[in-house]
Curated annotation (Swiss-Prot):
Its main location: nucleus. May be involved in transcriptional regulation. The gene is ZNF818P. One of its GO terms (molecular function) is zinc ion binding. Gene3D superfamilies: Classic Zinc Finger. This is Putative zinc finger protein 818. Belongs to the krueppel C2H2-type zinc-finger protein family. The keyword DNA-binding applies. Pfam families: zf-C2H2 (PF00096).
């Protein structure tokens, strides 16, 4: 049932939305490679390709500002901070703020002199940074 719904949503013959053009070209090459396989009928390949295209669209997150396509929602959240200017991680030592926790942890080396902060220290620093950023 789901298979039938996915293939009816978009057929390979329909023009694709602009952001999928390069994806469609790559999938067309994949389709030609599948055509060479004797065990797979042409209609099966088209169904497979349309499922891949629909899966690509459904599984990816699209930012509403710049149109960048990202593979995971967490990446989308981090990327959107570029547009909003939100910096959730604030250093309690110097007040410098960061959009990503990993960059904040790397910054802490400036204050601690440690090359590899231990795991408990990292968790404590992230908590402090988030708390200071939220109470700002």
């Amino acid at each position: 049932m789901l298979e039938r719904n996915l293939t009816s949503m978009m057929s390979v013959e329909e023009p694709l939305p602009r952001p999928l053009t390069s994806l469609y070209i790559r999938l067309s090459i994949l389709e030609r490679n599948h055509m060479n396989m004797t065990y797979m009928a042409k209609s099966s390949v088209k169904i497979h390709i349309s499922k891949v295209i629909i899966g690509f669209v459904l599984k990816r997150s699209l930012t509403n500002v710049c149109g960048k396509v990202l593979s995971q929602n967490s990446h989308l959240v981090n990327h959107q901070r570029i547009h909003t200017g939100e910096k959730s991680y604030r250093c309690h030592e110097c007040g410098k703020a960061f959009t990503q926790g990993s960059r904040f942890i790397n910054h802490q080396i400036v204050h601690t002199g440690e090359n590899f902060p231990n795991v408990l220290n990292v968790a404590r620093l992230l908590r402090m940074a988030l708390n200071s950023g939220l109470t700002k």
